[in-house]
């Protein structure tokens, strides 16, 4: 069953152009996505919208005109959008996700990653909405992988600590919420700097200059569209089964260091990789990282939830507009 509302569209006919008011179908399943302007949020919004959900996204600095502008630190603004829209599901993607930024701005990061998350969980519980809180593999110390949902977290850096505190705030304020821990993400970026994976592309392309690449930390690069699919499938199963709640893990299954990712990127585009230099020492600059925080995803797999895009395919789809001789296409496709 769907609702209906009016929408204006432009109709072109030979010799004429007119503005026409038409009725459009509005799906009755409603989802609110925070951080909808970000890499993951955009994918989550698109996934729900394309699968018969009425999706509303909210952001802050980059919100207009596509999304609602909401300051998640403003409890009144959060209350109003949730009560006005009455979502069945809320996917909370908004976060400060850069470990080094969190170390340098701990109070601001804690407000967004912890305080805002707890308040959102409280508001979701008040209207009976299912909240999916996006967390991180960085809640683990990386010494004993793979990690199951019930394993005891031990974050090494402040980012991981704020995400863990955010998990606690969510589950304390909303017993029916879900926590979804995920690893490093990539996908259709607007800028290469939007992902720790895609940011390597310039170093790969500029083969006339050697580049040091980390070959110590083991990562599991995961496409945002796969995480978005997991969020939708989890939401749809929850609408049929209220026992679906608690903590879940999702991750790609290809283990790679940044050096190995860079070499795979070079291979995908038939570019040289001899200028890339593997560095096997533990990084000494920036926030401490877990060496291998591999996530065990069997709980979601048992529910029949999940999909995985092979890295070579996903990274080629994501990066081809950023080839040096194709960057003009960004104005068209991004």
From Swiss-Prot:
The source's domain of life comes to: Eukaryota
User: What would be one Pfam family of this protein?
Assistant: RmlD_sub_bind
A single GO cellular-component term from the record reads: methionine adenosyltransferase complex
Q: Which residues carry this modification: Phosphothreonine?
A: 309
* SUPFAM superfamilies from the UniProt entry: NAD(P)-binding Rossmann-fold domains
Give the span(s) annotated as Required for interaction with MAT2A.
319-334
Q: Name one GO molecular function term.
A: methionine adenosyltransferase regulator activity
Alphabetic keyword roster: NADP, One-carbon metabolism, Phosphoprotein
Q: Does the keyword NADP apply?
A: yes
Record's protein name: Methionine adenosyltransferase 2 subunit beta
Whose protein is this, by species? Bos taurus
